[in-house]
Amino acid sequence: MFGILNRGHKIKGTVVLMTKNVFDFNEFVSTTRGGIVGAAGGLFGAATDIVGGIVDGATAIFSRNIAIQLISATKTDGLGNGKVGKQTFLEKHLPSLPNLGDRQDAFNVYFEWDENFGIPEAFYIKNFMQSEFFLVSLTLEDIPNHGTIHFVCNSWVYNAKSYKRDRIFFANKTYLPNETPASLVKYRKEELENLRGDGTGERKEYDRIYDYAVYNDLGNPDKNKNLARTTLGGSSDFPYPRRGRTGRKSTRKDPKCEIPTSDTYIPRDENFGHLKSGDFLTYAIKSLTQNVLPTFQKAFGFNNEFDTFEDVRGLFEGGLYLPTDVISKISPIPVLKEILRTDGEQVLKFPPPHVIRVTKSAWMTDEEFGREMLAGVNPCLIQRLQEFPPKSKLDVTVYGDQTSTMTKEHLEINLGGLTVEEALHGNRLFILDHHDAFIPYLERINDLPTAKCYATRTILFLKDDNTLKPLAIELSLPNPGGKGANSRVILPADGGAESTIWLLAKAYVVVNDSCYHQLMSHWLNTHAVMEPFVIATNRHLSVLHPIYKLLLPHYRDTMNINALARQSLINAGGVIERSFLPGEFAVEMSSAVYKSWVFTDQALPADLIKRGMAVEDPSSPYGLRLVVEDYPYAVDGLEIWDTIQTWVKDYVSLYYPTNDAVKKDTELQAWWKEAVEKGHGDLKDKPWWPKLNTPQDLIHTCSIIIWIASALHAAVNFGQYPYGGFILNRPTITRRLLPEPGTKEYGELTSNYQKAYLRTITGKVEAIVDLSVIEILSRHASDEVYLGQRDNPNWTNNIKALQAFKRFGQKLKEIEEKIMGRNKDSSLRNRNGPVKMPYTVLLPTCEDEGLTFRGIPNSISI
């Protein structure tokens, strides 16, 4: 008889779960709150409590402690809700089930069934143990007249007393709200209510509640008044995307600010439950920033200078001697031991960054300086110059006239006979403009004890070989007498003091760019803007909703890494403030940039057109033509953007054939309304927000979200160490202004240009801090899930959706081959540049872990 097992009228199921990991981040923090020293014993001593004696026999522990009840989608009880079956418990442990993942355990479970129960498409689960577990999946086999049903769960399940309602999971079927079987409507609605909460109280570890809050937890005024920071979000002066609400208590000194903590709440399922302990990268960041980096200050603080470029290269060749107390804080931590490469010796040694692996000094060339604006770690800021001289968008009544002081004569010296007008008309002049972002803060930045810098504008010329040649750099300071700026224009030079001044001018540009990249291009434009979409999706789109299934992989670990950033990276006194020029003003500067953020401009074609890097052209691929044909980020990115949009169109079309289908989807409309009005509430009245009235609106909106989470983040994140690991190439701080003629420092420009450069840029301690962190941020985990991949093949039961997804993956493989082919084309000089470093960061996949400089993860997970 089909579907009926020998055990009688019973359905066989297989439950896959993971026990609580000994390296679970929150648990580790709580067990090692006193510091890392001596943590080896404490950590492994805690393992017994965490695992809960699982080694004594999984079957004995789980057999009467985890109960499941099936819920019918086709048969109802007296109230019209799906029938709930009898409670049944896990049975036999299956230690060798095929395809069982790392640290996963499988168990049999048997359910009584008869035809009056119908088809189960949901289930309740209760955990009667004190320790939580991570439920991966439930698979029901041979349902009579139906076959196999998959439940993809991926959720932490705590003791049943932790929840007001029983935990419920749904099968991998997809229903629009108005198509939901009547028997499941109540369950679908209640689960969303569970996830929204009531907006009150302090969140507990086991909570799964998603809600919004402003960025009021970066400072710590109770500890030190100098650690007070402006609240970002909730005002027109300091607008910001929202973060996840924690409900923590306020500080004593400022009731509007939350008390910072090392145990920041995020909804439990947003916490890492899948990483192997050996490459728990965010755990490494936490340990590094709180325990190891302070010892670097002690170890190297007495001599915070590199004396030669060779000293800097020594970080990757011979290494730096480390005192014993520093080693003792690294050795118990496998990730740090690997990253900092002490190898049991008292030497700190970093891996060679890609930018110096082939040539040691090509980073200094003007061609590489220009190339990295097209194929570096921040390739989405350069613009085509469309008016000369460049003008400012700053308020004239506040800042005065900030128009550039560059003249035609400054440029035409190196234009090869062209006039500025001819070069402008021929689309051959480009600008990297950091003036407006820095001028409002520069006076305060330069008052900091270790920071001295300029606001910069750089104009470049597009040569016949498609490379960019820098023509002039403008260095500006606020006018000490009032409004306007004091500016100086620096031109390229080949010898003497002038050549060192040119090298220093490029350093001021790169420091502007490094800071803008880290705070705006990277943190704000990917991490921060994505979190509201994560929150709104979980609050308003059921797991049964097609758009939930589409977007879910692109949210993986984002809230977790963002919470970690607030704790250790962008917080008051954190890594960014200590190792980047703006110091305490860093995150506040990103708020000023958010004022002009436009959601629809995040689509790559719109971004390129807005920056003048492309023009609309119906006869060209993707409907636009690049002004710089050899623009690696744009060329590779457009292929990926188009493929993402095609996949989203194929998928959305399966569920939304008409405009009405979009308009009448109550969950969808509530999702987008809240994402805009609450998640990005400070910009909610902007006219550019799309309305979800048509399938095309939905396709474009989802494509932008996926693009930001995947390719855009990959482009601005995974090149950080390959380019910036060599601090000479991408310094993060300048500590002094250009020297005045007649001074000792001016004499060094000719007598010892390396010393002049090194005394100007990032010092030794700050460089080590920066390198230590960006190496972690640039790494891929061993279980990374890349664009075109899913962590579970049963994420949907829709065959057409699975087929469309397969086409998506195949297309990405084709793009990968094209990118590798372009990198081998010697006529495309910007693909490798003088440093001979192929542009691989947008290769979609990667088979290796670590510092690969390739691979597009689905989500912002690091």
UniProtKB/Swiss-Prot annotation:
InterPro entries: LipOase, LipOase_C, LipOase_C_sf, LipOase_CS, LipOase_Fe_BS, LipOase_plant, Lipoxy_PLAT/LH2, Lipoxygenase_dom_3. Residues 44-171 form the PLAT domain. Fe cation binds at H522, H527, H713, N717, I862. It is an enzyme of class 1 (oxidoreductase). Its cofactor is Fe cation. One of its GO terms (cellular component) is cytoplasm. SMART domains: LH2. It comes from the Eukaryota. Residues 242-251 have a biased composition (Basic residues). The keyword Metal-binding applies. Residues 174-862 form the Lipoxygenase domain. It is found in: Cytoplasm. It holds the Pfam family PLAT. One of its GO terms (biological process) is fatty acid biosynthetic process. Pathway: Lipid metabolism; oxylipin biosynthesis. Residues 225-257 are annotated as: Disordered. It catalyses: (9Z,12Z)-octadecadienoate + O2 = (13S)-hydroperoxy-(9Z,11E)-octadecadienoate; (9Z,12Z,15Z)-octadecatrienoate + O2 = (13S)-hydroperoxy-(9Z,11E,15Z)-octadecatrienoate; (9Z,12Z)-octadecadienoate + O2 = (9S)-hydroperoxy-(10E,12Z)-octadecadienoate. Monomer. Belongs to the lipoxygenase family. Plant lipoxygenase may be involved in a number of diverse aspects of plant physiology including growth and development, pest resistance, and senescence or responses to wounding. It catalyzes the hydroperoxidation of lipids containing a cis,cis-1,4-pentadiene structure. This is Linoleate 9S-lipoxygenase 1.
